[in-house]
């Protein structure tokens, strides 16, 4: 397959390219003589799609502002321009040039209380980051040829000395999330992508026995949730256990 990936500087994109040797990737990044692909600028995107339209058929839209989470609270305008308007710009270009969009979303679009969320469950983000990604999902769903992957992924090794003991998620490492994405490219609709439900602390402790616990009450700069775990039955029907 011929695939354009936004967010080319990110670890997720790098794993996609490394793991997807059988595919052809375009990863436009900023260079001295090239400004890169700015999703906030529709005409920049349109120009790139027009120049490269015969070099790709799929767009994995992973370009977004994610961390630190507090940036979405402190600067919602930047979050809107990048994660909502930027996604809408990519969608419009995909519609114009007849490309399939695979949108990398998040488990933070769910309410984060009851856990085991299915793709059909109601969405009620508990952070402005979650709202920004849900806004992107709305734009993506306006275009029929789409796939939305709601993910819970983290770097390996875990980049912090402490991990939440009282927050459950369905986390997987970024490399594993990239493996799953490559197996799902021809699917459509919405699919939850993640590992088993467990606390962030327990997930990290499997690789780092020295990790220290931290609790939700210790975090004050951004809203957090107790249980963002997802039901991944739909994902498991498509991939086999050897993928992750």
Enumerate the predicted regions with their spans.
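NAD(P)-cofactor binding segment of oxidoreductase domains
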Residues: 73-102
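Adenosine-cofactor binding site in Rossmann-like domains, unifying the SAM/SAH pocket
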Residues: 24-48
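NAD(P)H-binding glycine-rich loop region in Rossmannoid oxidoreductase-like domains
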Residues: 42-82
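Active-site "gating" loop of Rossmann-like NAD(P)-dependent oxidoreductase/epimerase domains
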Residues: 65-77, 106-126
């Amino acid at each position: 397959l011929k695939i354009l990936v936004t967010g080319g500087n990110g670890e997720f994109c790098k794993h996609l390219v490394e793991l997807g040797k059988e595919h052809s990737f375009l990863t436009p990044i900023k260079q001295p003589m090239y400004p890169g692909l700015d999703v906030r600028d529709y005409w920049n995107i349109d120009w790139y799609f027009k120049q490269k339209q015969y070099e790709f058929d799929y767009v994995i839209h992973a370009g977004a502002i994610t961390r630190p989470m507090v940036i979405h609270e402190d600067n919602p305008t930047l979050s809107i321009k990048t994660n909502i308007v930027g996604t809408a710009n990519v969608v419009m270009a995909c519609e114009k040039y007849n490309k399939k969009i695979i949108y990398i979303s998040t488990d933070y679009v769910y309410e984060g209380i009851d856990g085991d969320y299915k793709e059909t469950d109601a969405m009620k983000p508990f952070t402005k980051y979650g709202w920004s990604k849900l806004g992107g999902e709305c734009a993506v769903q306006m275009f029929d040829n789409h796939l939305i992957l709601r993910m819970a992924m983290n770097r390996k090794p875990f980049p912090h000395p402490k991990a939440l003991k009282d927050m459950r998620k369905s986390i997987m490492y970024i490399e594993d999330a990239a493996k799953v994405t490559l197996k799902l490219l021809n699917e459509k609709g919405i699919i939850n992508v993640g590992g088993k439900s467990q606390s962030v602390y327990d997930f990290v402790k499997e690789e780092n026995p020295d990790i220290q616990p931290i609790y939700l009450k210790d975090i004050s700069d951004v809203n957090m949730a107790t249980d963002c775990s997802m039901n991944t039955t739909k994902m498991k029907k498509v991939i086999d256990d050897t993928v992750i």
